Amino acid sequence: MSNSTSTPNTGLSYKDAGVDIEAGDALVDRIKSVAKRTTRPEVMGGLGGFGALCKIPKGYEEPVLVSGTDGVGTKLRLALNLNRHDTIGQDLVAMCVNDLLVCGAEPLFFLDYYATGHLNVDVAANVVTGIGKGCELAGCALVGGETAEMPGMYEGEDYDLAGFAVGVVEQSKIIDGSKVKSGDVLIGVASSGAHSNGYSLLRKILDVKNVDLTQVIDGRPLADVAMEPTRIYVKPVLELCKQVDVHAMAHITGGGLPGNLPRVLPNGAQAVINEASWEWPELFKLLQREGNVERFEMYRTFNCGVGMVIAVDANDAEKAIEVLNAQGEKAWKIGHIQENAESVEGADEKIRVIFE
């Protein structure tokens, strides 16, 4: 038996395990003003409750709720590498609300999930400020979220994001693609850049080819162009829906034009895209050139300058373009719909969408 005197054990705390409750509380205090700026009259109460309450807006006869969730992919890795955290939150909101918009829904509220190995309050506050800006652009309320500090799950201050949005649409005005017919015109709406898709290939090209991120393209450093936040189309497109009978919409995300257009096409309808109708932004030209990427691979990986495609009757096409342009968007005729018996659900994307 040892005669040595033992030192009394010191009790361990949650902070010793890597979780700083005070830092989490400080973050909540920092973001309350952000959430307040996004509030809507339907929201009941503020941040801090176990659940967020929201009324259905007045004026709906048969309201249908629409929900969606998304992330920002490996654009987040680029943000971490560049130490730029002020716009990635806007990307997160955009990816969710633009998806709701496709069926004609007005976004009501948004929640976020922020997970990290070690909470950096300044970084997290920057991210949430971007989320707030995105919510303001979309007209939806930031009603809550979750900040999870999980040591051992993430490396240092690296973090991951997820977003959740809920919107509402009148049942009789749901846009589901069922009206799409041969002769409809497809309208392209310009993207602001790569948005939040294709960044694994983008980063691979930049890394393998040692591309200089300070080089200037389109009058800006490449790093700025690559981090340009995803465009939020909510307000302009909802205005369009008030003035024009929209037959279908596709948010051009992962899978590009050939991967997303078929999601809103009825059987027997084939999308024909006129490649000469627009010029790829310099970012995509650079990526194709530096990576020697085959053209169709570019189309199925990146949006190539097209963030949204909208199908309308040919007689409404000019008005639709005028409405969108008046709202500050860049819109143009990008193609049309034609009949093709082989263009059915499950068919190869090269049959459902053709480029000419």
Curated annotation (Swiss-Prot):
It comes from Acinetobacter baumannii (strain ATCC 17978 / DSM 105126 / CIP 53.77 / LMG 1025 / NCDC KC755 / 5377). This is Phosphoribosylformylglycinamidine cyclo-ligase. Pathway: Purine metabolism; IMP biosynthesis via de novo pathway; 5-amino-1-(5-phospho-D-ribosyl)imidazole from N(2)-formyl-N(1)-(5-phospho-D-ribosyl)glycinamide: step 2/2. Gene3D superfamilies: PurM-like C-terminal domain (3.90.650.10), PurM-like, N-terminal domain (3.30.1330.10). Its EC number is 6.3.3.1. It comes from the Bacteria. Its main location: cytoplasm. The keyword ATP-binding applies. It is an enzyme of class 6 (ligase).
